[in-house]
């Protein structure tokens, strides 16, 4: 008889839940719920289990916030809870709550070639460290290492490191944003809101007044080639994505590959392919040769957060992935 566990991927707006086959890792019966409609994460889980008549003993849920102990208070939602209390209330034997990019990183060993698009570099080196990052509402970052037949995710808050410009244009952007918001982190330019910040800084640096645009407006105008400012912003976004990925590669020697997740890049895939992304990635001066062979992949799997939550739980309970 197939044994299933609950897996989840929870952001500021939606909670996506599914069942994971504990033998194969296959994800099934995924459903998305609006977080605004429920008073707690536990309430959403109960609704899902009732709707699917699911009897599970174990679960792993990825959440877009730092996980530092038993008490979890979501950064971009009102939900807050004790992991131990929720486990007890649900009658689970095992409940893991992990960072969303821990889950994405743990999905990488489970991905097949059709789930990836490569942007330069050679083949990944087996057993070497891996980096994963992705722009969405914010900028998520994690690393993954393989030690003693186990995958170990190294999550952190790498999206909040300083934005490090490396061209005259990027320097001007930094000065404009610093004057407006103070500290300028990488997330301030590499995210949905970050794309807006880039557009606004480009226009303001030219002494003009920016329009009140949303990220999708800027992307649409750039792709249609109807707004030079939007096109410059999107082009700069791609280059800075490359620079940031190259920094991750240097930091941990990620010859196992650098992986891009998140919902933004797939929206302008052809533009991204033709952009200065790889040039930015390799623009490391004396260490250009060091990063040239490191492959970069875009993850195009529908639910890497669910897949990785399942992988994390299976490994925690003793399986070798």
Curated annotation (Swiss-Prot):
Residues that, per the record, bind ATP: 8-13
NCBIfam families, per the entry: glk, PRK00292.1-1, PRK00292.1-3, PRK12408.1
Similarity field: Belongs to the bacterial glucokinase family.
Taxonomic lineage: Bacteria, Pseudomonadati, Pseudomonadota, Gammaproteobacteria, Enterobacterales
PANTHER family hit by this protein: GLUCOKINASE
Predominant location: cytoplasm
Alphabetically ordered keywords of this record: ATP-binding, Cytoplasm, Glycolysis, Kinase, Nucleotide-binding, Transferase
Descriptive protein name: Glucokinase
Gene Ontology molecular function: any one: glucokinase activity
Highest taxon above the source species: Bacteria
Reactions that this protein is recorded to catalyse: D-glucose + ATP = D-glucose 6-phosphate + ADP + H(+)
Gene3D superfamilies the record matches: 3.30.420.40, 3.40.367.20
GO biological process, one term: glycolytic process
The enzyme's E.C. designation: 2.7.1.2
Gene Ontology CC annotations of this record: cytosol
Family matches, as HAMAP family: Glucokinase
Keyword ATP-binding: yes
